[in-house]
């Protein structure tokens, strides 16, 4: 009898039990598609990419309104496959094409993203790609998605093994200076907060008043000068 791995079983299930509706993203690292279960009609997101799936596996038992539910996650020979909840809604990036958020709305979104990051950071994970394209607004809930660039913080590492993230949002340490930790996500969240308020990167125009002071502290070059945790940032918002 041939032994079937969890990874192979997941690929087989997606191939035979689901219809692919459309591709959301494709890159040299892999692809992300929306699939529909043939029997139930329920839609899911299916990811397959080169890289570690450890963060997705740690998220399997987690239920948080600001993170997608991970249904299955498997890894084999450096390849990861993930089946996750399909979050219905527009991305924050799409919303910002037509309008800015009010300060109250921006604060609410940022607090919810802090809650999502607190969950990730509590399990030792760093998202490393917090940006408007990776935030879906589902009703009144902001949902942080896409953990393909995420990694687990390791005490023994001096720097990140891969340079991942988005230029303009990635913290300086993500470019190999030293290992990124939860404060890298604080940096990215500060950039996001400024953009939803002003439409511009903080290097071009800083938000006014208290929110501007918060953005400035989030985006300090030295990690030790930023808010040290998502909870600390949440407390000042």
What do the predicted segments below correspond to?
Residues 77-91, 95:
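Conserved short submotifs of the Hanks-type protein kinase catalytic core
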Residues 19-58:
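ATP-binding glycine-rich loop module of kinase domains
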Residues 63-72:
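Conserved HxN/HPN-centered segment at the entrance to the catalytic loop
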Residues 109-110:
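Activation segment signature within eukaryotic-like protein kinase domains
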Residues 121-137:
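Catalytic-loop of the protein kinase fold
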Residues 185:
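Conserved catalytic-loop aspartate of Hanks-type protein kinases
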Residues 159-173:
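Conserved activation segment of eukaryotic-like protein kinases, specifically the C-terminal portion
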Residues 226:
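Conserved HRD-motif arginine in the catalytic loop of eukaryotic-like protein kinases
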